[in-house]
């Protein structure tokens, strides 16, 4: 068992019965020219987040944790995104951006596109699981719950983008399904102003889970791991 220093209190878990979840580290969310950038969100400070996720993934894999990668998006025709009868059609900034700029149709968050791909620095390895998801929450219309329960996994460590959207949505849904969720704050990035990050982390540590950071996480898995990985 491992005890991780976190807010509001430490949490104990078995790494080999836990999963590190990497949420939507796609060009869409972390790279200039991707969907968030084109929609007017600032992605200029995502590079340190990518590096921190690399560090966390390496430490988690060495400790025997399952690594799960999410990719958010839809088919090329956007059938999976829902039509006018879906609130997603009206609230998705990617869909709204494409309606405003028709030349982008088929380029944002479409499976097979550059936008949909994971950033070059983050490459899933054999034994990892890569899951597509059609909505903010990784539990909605995906086999995530079944994958976790069949492996006896109850503790989830979250990284990725966006803290205040897909990361928080997935962690919240996990809370309702009796999963213990921890977010590594320096391995996440918000969509929007900095207060959105602070608000999401406040919600998580106060109501739905725990908040820690990459160095503390790596040190908890192995006291010498962070120095070695860094």
From Swiss-Prot:
Keywords: Hydrolase. The active site is at 24 (proton acceptor), 133, 166 (nucleophile). CDD domains: cysteine_hydrolases. SUPFAM superfamilies: Isochorismatase-like hydrolases (SSF52499). Its EC number is 3.5.1.110. InterPro entries: Isochorismatase-like_dom, Isochorismatase-like_hydrls, Isochorismatase-like_sf, RutB. It catalyses: (Z)-3-ureidoacrylate + H2O + H(+) = (Z)-3-aminoacrylate + NH4(+) + CO2; (Z)-3-ureidoacrylate + H2O = (Z)-3-aminoacrylate + carbamate + H(+); (Z)-2-methylureidoacrylate + H2O + H(+) = (Z)-2-methylaminoacrylate + NH4(+) + CO2. The keyword Iron does not apply. Induction: Up-regulated by the nitrogen regulatory protein C (NtrC also called GlnG) and repressed by RutR. The Rut pathway degrades exogenous pyrimidines as the sole nitrogen source at room temperature but not at 37 degrees Celsius, a restriction that is apparently a consequence of an inadequate ability to remove toxic malonic semialdehyde at the higher temperature (RutE/YdfG function). Hydrolyzes ureidoacrylate to form aminoacrylate and carbamate. The carbamate hydrolyzes spontaneously, thereby releasing one of the nitrogen atoms of the pyrimidine ring as ammonia and one of its carbon atoms as CO2. This is Ureidoacrylate amidohydrolase RutB.
């Amino acid at each position: 068992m491992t005890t991780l220093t976190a807010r509001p209190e430490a949490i104990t878990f078995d790494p080999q019965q836990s999963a590190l979840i990497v949420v939507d580290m796609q060009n869409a969310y972390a790279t200039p020219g991707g969907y968030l950038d084109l929609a007017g969100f600032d992605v200029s400070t995502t590079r340190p987040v990518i590096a921190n996720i690399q560090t966390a993934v390496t430490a988690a894999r060495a400790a025997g944790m399952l690594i799960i990668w999410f990719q958010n998006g839809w088919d090329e025709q956007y059938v999976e995104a829902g039509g006018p009868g879906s609130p997603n059609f009206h609230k998705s900034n990617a869909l709204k951006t494409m309606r405003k700029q028709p030349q982008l149709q088929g380029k944002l968050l479409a499976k097979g596109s550059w936008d949909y791909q994971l950033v070059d620095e983050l490459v899933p390895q054999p034994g990892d699981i890569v899951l597509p998801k059609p909505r903010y929450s990784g539990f909605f219309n995906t086999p995530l719950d079944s994958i976790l329960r069949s492996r006896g996994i109850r503790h989830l460590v979250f990284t990725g983008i966006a803290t205040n959207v897909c990361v928080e949505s997935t962690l919240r849904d996990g809370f309702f399904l009796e999963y213990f969720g921890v977010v590594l704050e320096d391995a996440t990035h918000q969509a929007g102003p900095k207060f959105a990050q602070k608000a999401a982390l406040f919600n998580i540590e106060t109501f739905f889970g725990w908040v820690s950071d990459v160095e503390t996480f790596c040190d908890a898995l192995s006291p010498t791991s962070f120095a070695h990985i860094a």
